[in-house]
Amino acid sequence: MATGVWVVESSLHDLDGAVTFEQRRFPKLIELHEELGSLLPKETMTIAGPYWGMNLVLWARGLVKFAAIGLGNAYQYHIPGGPPPPPANKRVALTALRRWAVASPDLKQWIQKNLNERISKTDPAHAQFLEVERLIERAMNSDDLGRRQIARFYKEWFDKIASAPHSGRALALYQDLSSAYVLGKTLTDLPKNEPGSRKPDRVARQLMLNCL
């Protein structure tokens, strides 16, 4: 008998911000894990992902024991032997927004504009964005720098939620994403070369609405 179950929706790239995510795809994924949880023995090892945020949502809600994450340029599962993934853009994590974006001169200008016009210097997000802005040019010219910055942020994000008691992790993740959503609502749209949603708040909002 199997002692573990690993479930991943390979077509789901939860950073895309598609309008179907929050009302249909994310709830359906949650329902699937709820049903599995009702059928599997309690001691079964359960794993979800890799995704960007839905793995954390499922884990924080107690629907899986482990959240699988991506390594490299994609937080998404690619089926072995399937079509090769498209060439990856070089990205950086926008830590205050709980998402990533393509590292480009346009992103650097976008950050500078919002730092000057939208984000107070007393806001902790100001220092976070300033750090990213200083990284972008080097990330554009490196195959590794952006990946390391994203991985470092992701570990810090995971550790923050993991520090909450088991029963409070879903609420902790909700509150964390809520702060990112509120900030994102005040910012201008991301550059036109961003392949996912250009709305700074959308990724956090869609994940937040499925935390509880």
Name each region found by the language model:
Residues 60, 65-106:
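Short helix/strand-capping turn motifs
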Residues 5, 99-102, 205-209:
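Generic preference for hydrophobic/aromatic residues in regular secondary structure cores
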